[in-house]
């Protein structure tokens, strides 16, 4: 029939036929109830109102999007983490086994996926575990994976596990184990527990951190004859001054502490020992001239007898 400029067909999406079988149900212009095909798309009405969300019809479950269109040929993750698959005609698999994209699944009497298996939705991988979408660290077939709070799998990145151990999630999601690997130009070794075992720099969440004994290093660390100070979260100090144990240090843009050189900070002059600590309450002779550094490590000026070049006349 033609009604209000729309081509309407009345019936239900069929499991064996994409076209509905017309029932004895009567659809009125106002107050219609049941399935209606409008311009080739199926919608479900109750008392004239287009429905959304979960609907049950003839013992089968359907899910209707916000615009009333029904899900078909796709997975859906419900708000409680349960997982469903909707067939080509819209109904969810019910109390059966099915093979989808090469993987086997079991569906219960409530249409939910049973057991554990991977699913691909919107180009992302999800792990169904005991019938629910898994989150956090998971183990599958002896490999470790990390799943976001929405269940999607992470890959191509460094992550810390719940014990603070460092792991690298490769392109297919599993953490490297029992092998060596070159990542972003740096070499790493991973043990059978998927923990990085050698001391090496990593980039995690856009920040440089140092892997040491399988965990993120903190505090003072030495690498390639340079000293670094790593904060409690493992990030390194850079482009800043720092006082530790009453000693003053300055860090360059790449994180190493300046050493054996002059440093000017906020208009004050400092000179740094080989370990990066600024001179303090002591004399320095350099270039044949003497300089005095005060308790705050700044070079003394004006309050002592200094020459035009800031050198002390100490003999």
Task: Place the predicted regions along the sequence by residue.
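Extracellular adhesion/carbohydrate-binding repeat motifs centered on closely spaced tryptophans
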Residues: 1-315
